[in-house]
Design a protein with these regions (language model features):
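N-terminal glutamine amidotransferase
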Residues: 1-41, 56-59, 151
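Active-site-adjacent bridging/hinge elements
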Residues: 126-134, 257-262, 283-285, 357-367
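PAPS-dependent sulfotransferase catalytic core
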Residues: 318-376
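Short, hydrophobic/amphipathic alpha-helical patches that form generic packing surfaces
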Residues: 7-21, 250-262, 381-398
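Conserved cytochrome P450 K-helix E-x-x-R motif and the immediately C-terminal K′/meander segment
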Residues: 261-263, 315-318
Length: 408
């Protein structure tokens, strides 16, 4: 790379993204929250406050003169509620709902179609056969080595329909949507768990982001230490909050701030689409972070987003809502079998990330051969992350690849 300070910055970025799937050393677009932000406060009529706040954000950001607006519609609670309030607020606006259908993946597109019809929105389904095909173009926009870039396809489609794109971003982090994580974390820890034990338990709840032999991935130029990773997460768990609230804090200060927001914002700028996120307004962030925990998550039934569900019940019957959280997600095992394995073999067998001394060639060859026999999802995810790093390297370090290159 050349400059030593640039090298160090990039090495840190590489380690973080390949372990956490985000880089917490970057400056976030919205402020991090502290543990004090998650102290409970008594509230009255929270559903009314939340709904009116979302409605006011829509009016403020869009106005009554706008003729057409796009919405990302996964079929889940957050996007369905956002669509419901959008239609109830702007009764005459033309709404284009966008859903993504990935080949070989389970999705909520059929559910989304019913919800779109209910609120008189034109439903557009973007079919993605090869999820990795336009990876060089997407990486050239965000300038970071990420592979899971579904938002690229959403915004690209939105640009052809409207100058506005509204979404339900923030619902999981602010209203308790990661129920699978809460249940697992609480089962792995207790009130006497140390800070380090809770950090390790939290990482276990993100086990698809890293692999058991994580430290062996890196080569001589990049020194990996789990202790450095623990240090990033420590403020979220070294505080007097109850364990559940500590997870709320860690979730907000993690992928939301350092993955989804910066990446989505880069796509919005590139395609010149104005984003509207009614759930993620500063007003709602300040309000919802202090909500009593039992208004977010019911541990007995393992159900989250309790307040959003209550509001949405005014607009939709329960049977119209997806029972299992899905969102826009690709089946990585099927992606690996159809395109990922061949692309990783082609680009990583003589990878520039190996020549640069970043990634361990022996690890690549050993794990690749094992994946041929048994594609484990954690290692598939890791190889897709390494493929993204290889593309980033060829775009910005060796500069031998063009953004228009298609991975086929």
């Amino acid at each position: 790379m050349g400059d030593s300070s640039t090298d160090d910055t990039n090495y840190l970025m590489i380690k973080n993204i390949l372990t956490l799937r985000y880089n917490p050393t970057k400056r976030s677009l919205i402020p991090k929250l502290s543990w004090r932000n998650f102290l409970e406060k008594n509230v009255s009529n929270p559903t009314h406050f939340i709904e009116e706040s979302m409605r006011n954000t829509i009016i403020k950001k869009i106005g009554h003169q706008t003729k057409r607006i796009s919405i990302a519609l996964s079929g889940g609670i957050d996007s369905a509620l956002t669509l419901a309030i959008l239609r109830d607020t702007l009764t005459n606006v033309n709404i284009d709902a966008i859903s993504i259908r990935f080949a070989g993946s389970i999705d909520e597109v059929d559910q989304a179609a019913i919800i779109a019809e209910k609120f008189e929105a034109n439903h557009h389904v973007v079919h993605i056969e090869n999820y990795l095909k336009e990876l060089p173009k997407a990486i050239s926009i965000i300038k970071l080595p990420f592979w899971d870039l579904h938002w690229y396809h959403v915004v690209k489609k939105a640009k052809s329909l409207s100058n506005f794109l509204i979404s339900g971003d923030g619902g999981d982090e602010l209203f308790g949507g990661y129920t699978f994580r809460y249940k697992k974390f609480l089962s792995l820890t207790n009130e006497d768990s140390t800070t380090l034990e809770k950090i390790k338990a939290y990482l276990q709840c993100h086990e698809r982001d890293w692999v058991p032999d994580q430290e062996k991935i890196f080569s001589k130029k990049i020194t990996f230490s789990w202790n450095k990773i623990y240090d990033f997460l420590k403020p979220n768990f070294d505080n007097p909050l109850p364990r559940l609230a500590q997870v709320f804090l860690a979730d907000f200060n993690g992928k939301l701030l350092y993955n989804w927001l910066p990446l989505n914002s880069a796509f919005h700028r590139h395609f010149e689409v104005k984003p509207i996120t009614p759930i993620l307004s500063q007003e709602l962030i300040s309000y919802t972070s202090h909500l009593p925990y039992n208004l977010k998550y019911d541990g007995q039934s393992n159900i989250g987003k309790l307040l959003l569900r209550k509001i949405l019940a005014k607009y939709l019957t329960r049977k119209l809502l997806a029972t299992k959280k899905q969102g826009f997600s690709v089946n990585t095992i099927n992606l690996w079998k159809s395109y990922g394995r061949e692309l990783c073999n082609y680009y990583l067998s003589d990878g520039r990330i190996l020549r640069q001394g970043w990634i361990n060639e022996k690890w690549i060859k050993s794990r690749m051969s094992k994946l041929d026999n048994e594609p484990q999802i954690r290692y598939v995810n890791k190889f897709l992350g390494l493929l993204a790093l290889e593309i980033w390297c060829r775009l910005y370090v060796t500069k031998e690849m063009k953004p228009t290159t298609l991975l086929v």
